[in-house]
Amino acid sequence: MPLAALPPELAGLRIVHLSDFHLGIPSRGAVAVERAIEWARRVAPDLVVVTGDLLSRPRAEPRLRELLGSLRPCYVVLGNHDVEHARDPFSRSAGLSDLSPARLLVDEAETLELRGRRVQLVGVDPRSYRTGRSRPWLLADPTAELRILLCHYPTVLRRLPADSFHVVLAGHMHDGQITLPLPLPRRRVLLAHPRAAYASGLYVRNGISMHVSPGLGTTFVPLRFYARPEATELVLERGRR
């Protein structure tokens, strides 16, 4: 992920981005989550970030805590399925709050030192985002040399003032989950979120770089088609955006 004005010390910084576990409902996604966590432990990145929709049923909360507790340092935000804003009739909110030792950010910020530089993480709560009350740029610290916003919804990118953050990490979209390939290069019909502007991958807007995770789990139906689950390692580089 190339970033303009990235301090030399932060070049090569590795961030593992995970999203949309949807644990609690039997599916191949649960296996993907287990494998992704094992892989993340093995690659030992500088930072692990999880961008919401952790559970589809509360019964998986103990296992979720075990998985997140094995990742250090780990920062988390909630998604709509975690706070009862899901249309999936099989989903039930677990009312998650504290996830220690993982750090859950609920409309709050935390600054840490990585490689001798100040890195700020700001987390958006899905409840305030959906009601339009969220103003994450007001939490941004202009003295931080790298500002990272965590939000379940990738559409947050449209709301951000230019250059308020360097990086946005989001999920929610499942890369369509079930898609139909078209006889054109890199073209598909996304059955989930068919008009999505940000389905998965890298985007740039107003000087801000965003990665949208395809996620690992599933909702409504326990399968994916032409929308593979993914755990992503992002490596920051100096360069033009």
Where are these regions (language model features)?
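N-terminal signal-anchor transmembrane helix
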Residues: M1-P45, A60-P62
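Beta-strand-turn-beta hairpins that frame and shape the catalytic cleft
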Residues: L3-V16, A102-R103, E110-V122, P142-L146, ...
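Acidic/histidine-rich helix-loop elements
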Residues: H17-E34, L55-S56, E84-S91, L182-R195, ...
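Solvent-exposed loop/turn segments at secondary-structure junctions
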Residues: L23, L54-R57, N80-E84, E110-L112, ...
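Core catalytic region of metal-dependent phosphoesterases/phosphodiesterases
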Residues: A30-E113
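Binuclear metal-dependent hydrolase catalytic cores centered on His/Asp/Glu-rich metal-binding motifs
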Residues: A86, S91-R103, E110, L114-C151, ...
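Conserved beta-sheet core of the metallophosphoesterase superfamily
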Residues: P154-V235
